[in-house]
């Protein structure tokens, strides 16, 4: 089972609102998901993005793959750098 961190479309016609969710890659875009880890509101200026850093970091360490859009959000929040550093530290520990 491959797990993705992706956008789940909410809102109404011409008023999009997205939840950032962890879901099985085989599930539909707006189908079942495992856990909600944030939201994205593109209507507000500037766009509002809320991320639950701890939950997202845990899922990334377990191997969840973010989609391109979510990866950009995570990079802006500094989570991708934190993940990279944590994986390097774990790799160095295993070599000792």
Swiss-Prot record:
One of its GO terms (biological process) is translation. Keywords: Ribonucleoprotein, Ribosomal protein. Transmembrane segments: none annotated. The lineage of its organism: Bacteria, Bacillati, Bacillota, Bacilli, Lactobacillales. InterPro entries: Ribosomal_bS16, Ribosomal_bS16_dom_sf. Belongs to the bacterial ribosomal protein bS16 family. The keyword Ribonucleoprotein applies. PANTHER family: 30S RIBOSOMAL PROTEIN S16, SMALL RIBOSOMAL SUBUNIT PROTEIN BS16M. One of its GO terms (cellular component) is cytoplasm. GO terms for molecular function: structural constituent of ribosome. This is Small ribosomal subunit protein bS16. Disulfide bonds: none annotated.
């Amino acid at each position: 089972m491959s797990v993705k961190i992706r956008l789940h479309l909410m809102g109404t016609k011409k008023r999009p609102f997205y939840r950032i969710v962890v879901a099985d890659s085989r599930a539909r875009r707006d189908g079942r998901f495992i856990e909600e880890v944030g939201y994205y509101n593109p209507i507000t200026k500037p766009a509002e993005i809320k991320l639950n850093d701890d939950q997202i970091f845990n899922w990334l360490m377990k191997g969840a793959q973010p989609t391109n859009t979510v990866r950009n959000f995570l990079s802006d929040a500094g989570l991708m750098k934190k993940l990279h550093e944590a994986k390097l530290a774990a790799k160095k520990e295993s070599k000792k």
